[in-house]
Amino acid sequence: MMDDSVSFAKSHKKEFIAKVVDGQVPAAKKTAIFMDGSPGAGKTEVATALEEMLSNICMIDADVFRSQFPEYNGSNSSEFQAGASLLVEYSLDYVLKKGYSFILDVTFAIGKSIENIERALKRDYLTTIYYVFQDPVIAWNFTKQREISEGRHVPKERFISAFINSRENI
């Protein structure tokens, strides 16, 4: 399914990007907000609150992308990670090149996050990092509760890896 998710992402990237920038315009004073923290820490809740407080800001969220894949059902979330990550890259490339302000709701579990911050700084974005911390037991319990309510499964190994790597990469 990973190859299918990548193929789907590549063939539909324009539609996904259009949804990200819908209603927004490039900004004279560009803002880049990077979210970090483990699954279940509350990143999306903080990002959503920021989006509501700020005007003219694009939200880039792999979870939103993943939910729009035709075969996605929540329990198979890891099968769509590659495609969703590719859409994050496409969207980030686009907003950086065109000068849109944005919130990037991801973890810093991969080293590419540092590169993305550097890219924003080089393009004169006012750049902020929000690190949302939650006790790992509480975050894991929230992740399991979210799986029941939303159907989105996060494998325990991925949770542990994201928790450790997001802290190390920040």
Identify the meaning behind each predicted range.
Residues 83-131:
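Glycine-rich phosphate-binding loop used to anchor ATP phosphates in small-molecule kinases
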Residues 38-39:
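The conserved Walker
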Residues 23-30, 95-96:
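Phosphate-binding P-loop
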Residues 141-170:
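Conserved GTP-binding G-domain of TRAFAC-class P-loop NTPases and closely related GTPase folds
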Residues 43:
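Conserved lysine of the Walker
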Residues 1-25:
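N-terminal pre-Walker A segment at the start of P-loop NTPase domains
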Residues 50-100:
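Conserved substrate/cofactor phosphate-moiety recognition/catalytic segment
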Residues 46:
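Hydrophobic positions on the alpha1 helix immediately C-terminal to the Walker A/P-loop
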